[in-house]
């Protein structure tokens, strides 16, 4: 009896791996975005895809980007210097549709969190006066994305996608970027 049970368990274990093969993909990639009236942001994107037993699958995505900028200018007798640091985080999820063995399209929706911190320093040359001002703005907004996944060979996945949102940081700023990644199917 034990030999029969062991044989059934062994057969099940050997065949179950074949049925679940290549149903998951983990991708890591480069993320880059342009921010309206600001410098660009750069960072990393992580995607996880689970393929169902149909052309449909589910994708989850996490993106982290950061960037900084500075500006210096004169206003009358004042010298002004602004420094800003921006951090962007997003968590998105959505469906993917496999067109054939090589190409899939996906759409994502979720939440983006943006934090901008900065300082302004001004110096008045005639009054010999120095002033400082600090700011910190946060925004949580709807984010969206779409893209293409290509499987050039069985266990490799390449991703090219778009991600965007509009952050309310004392005014609305459009953030539009792309994701370029490579992944492993298992």
What are these regions (language model features)?
Residues 38-43, 69-77, 117-127, 170-176:
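Outer-membrane beta-barrel translocator domains and adjoining extracellular loop/strand segments
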Residues 19-71:
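Short glycine/proline- and aromatic-enriched beta-strand/turn motifs that initiate or cap beta-hairpins
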Residues 42-46, 89-93, 142-146, 176-180:
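Hydrophobic, lipid-facing positions within transmembrane beta-strands of outer-membrane proteins
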Residues 24-26, 55-60, 102-105, 150, ...:
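Repeated loop/turn-to-beta-strand initiation elements of outer-membrane beta-barrel proteins
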Residues 30-34, 62-68, 111-117, 162-168, ...:
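Transmembrane beta-strands of outer-membrane beta-barrel pores
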Residues 38-40, 83-88, 134-141, 172-174:
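Short sequence motifs at beta-strands and strand-loop junctions characteristic
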Residues 97, 149-151, 155-157, 175-186:
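Outer-membrane beta-barrel "beta-signal"
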Residues 32, 50, 95-97, 148-150, ...:
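Residue-level signature of outer-membrane beta-barrel architecture
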């Amino acid at each position: 009896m034990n030999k029969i049970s062991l044989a059934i368990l062994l057969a099940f274990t050997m065949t179950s791996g074949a049925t679940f093969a290549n149903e998951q993909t983990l991708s890591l990639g480069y993320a880059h975005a342009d921010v309206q009236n600001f410098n660009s942001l750069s960072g990393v994107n992580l995607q996880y895809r689970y393929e169902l037993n149909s052309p449909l699958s589910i994708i989850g995505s996490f993106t982290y980007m950061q960037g900084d900028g500075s500006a210096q200018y004169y206003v009358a007798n004042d010298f002004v210097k602004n420094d800003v640091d921006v951090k962007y985080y997003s968590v998105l999820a959505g469906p993917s549709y496999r067109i054939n063995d090589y190409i899939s399209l996906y759409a994502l929706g979720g939440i983006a969190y943006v934090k901008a911190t900065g300082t302004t320093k001004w110096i008045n040359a005639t009054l010999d006066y120095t002033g400082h001002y600090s700011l910190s703005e946060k925004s949580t907004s709807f984010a969206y994305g779409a893209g293409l996944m290509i499987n050039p060979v069985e266990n490799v996945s390449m991703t090219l996608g778009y991600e965007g949102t509009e952050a309310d940081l004392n005014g609305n700023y459009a953030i539009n970027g792309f994701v370029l990644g490579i992944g492993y199917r298992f």
